[in-house]
Structure formats: C-alpha cells, structure tokens
A protein has these predicted regions:
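N-terminal intrinsically disordered/low-complexity leader segments
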Residues: 1-5
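Hydrophobic/aromatic-rich alpha-helical bundle segments in the mid-to-C-terminal region
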Residues: 123-127, 144-196
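Hydrophobic alpha-helical connector segments
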Residues: 55, 68-104, 157-162, 186
Length: 198
C-alpha cells in the first residue's frame, strides 16, 4: 500500500511541477521534495527522469482524451445512426481559436512534442495516446458524414486536422492583431466539412 501511495504522490507532485515550471524546468529533486520522498524512490518507480515524464505526460494526455471522449459520447455511440450527429453538432463541440483553455492545452502539447526527440519512453507513450485520440476523432468525423458514399481517406485527413487543432491555435495566437476570429474559423470549417459531403 505504501509503495502505491508513494507512486501516486510522486505523480501528483510531478504534475504540479509541470504546471509550474514546464518540462524543461522540471527537476527530479523538486518532485521528490514536494512528494515528501527520495530521488532514489522516484528512480525505483520510474527508472529515470525520462520514465517519470513519460508516465506523467502520458497520463495527462489520456485524461484530456477522456474528456474529449465524454464530450463526443453521442457521436461515438454504436447506437447512434450515421448522419444523426451532424456537421453542425460537430462544430458546436469543437474548440475555437481564441479559447484560452485550449490555447493553454496547445502550449502543453507543444512542449510535450518538443521533448519527444530526446525521450524514447515519452515518444512511445505519446504515440499510444495520439493514436487513441485519432481513432476516436476518426469515428466522430465518419459519423458526422451524411454522404451517400463516404470517402474514408477524407475522413482520415479531417480526423488528423481536428485532432491537431491545439497546435493551430498556438500559431493563431502569435498573429496578434491579425488573428483569425472564432466566427471566421467556424464559418470556414462548416463550408469545408459540408463540401466533403457533396
């Protein structure tokens, strides 16, 4: 039980440190201090800093995908007929460029992606979570397509685009006064998605 409790404390402490100082600033010593444990015990649980980051960042990404899955539960249900969940329904649930919440998530995602090249353990975990997100998004997109002959290739491309929105929002935030408005963005997506169904 103590072993399990210490692991949970370490994960909670690492999440706190990531929110405070980001991936680059995270120090195992600080995590140990906040978790009221030792660096050696952290290494016993996670092998090294890379292992700790892989576990914690992977968990955080999975938690966000859980929220995504809950948000689109109707579209993901096997009992929902294809086409009952419409493009309009999809647009109502998708994040918009100027959402502060999703801009923050985008920055977190960018930090995580930047760390992948030097952390094979993190890459392996984020590959799993990214593929999970893509599979869920692909099902949502397919269910929103009312075409008589759906194009599965289009579905895959749109699913990739939708699951990568947070990164688009970061770029939009950097445009300053030239930012794309939420209305422009939503109008374009509606026209784009509808054009794929003709």
């Amino acid at each position: 039980m103590e072993n399990s409790n210490s692991r949970e404390r370490i994960i909670a402490a690492a999440k706190h440190e990531l929110h405070e100082v980001g991936i680059l600033g995270l120090r195992v010593q600080d995590v140990a201090k906040r978790a009221n444990t030792s660096v050696s015990l952290i290494y016993k649980h996670f092998e090294d800093r890379d292992g700790l980051l892989a576990q914690v960042l992977g968990d955080m990404h999975d938690e966000r995908i859980d929220m995504w899955e809950q948000l689109f539960s109707h579209a993901l249900s096997d009992s929902t007929p294809r086409g009952e969940f419409t493009v309009e329904d999809l647009l109502l649930k998708l994040p918009t460029p100027n959402s502060i919440h999703f801009q923050t998530l985008g920055m977190d995602r960018a930090q995580t992606l930047a760390a992948l090249s030097n952390n094979p353990k993190l890459r392996a975990r984020i590959e799993q979570t990214t593929q999970r997100l893509f599979a869920l998004t692909l099902k949502v997109v397919a269910n929103a397509d009312k075409s008589a002959e759906p194009n599965t290739s289009n579905h895959r491309v749109v699913a990739l685009m939708v699951s990568s929105l947070n990164l688009i929002f970061i770029n939009n935030d950097l445009l300053g006064d030239h930012r794309i408005t939420d209305a422009e963005y939503t109008s374009f997506l509606k026209a784009f998605f509808n054009s794929l169904q003709k």
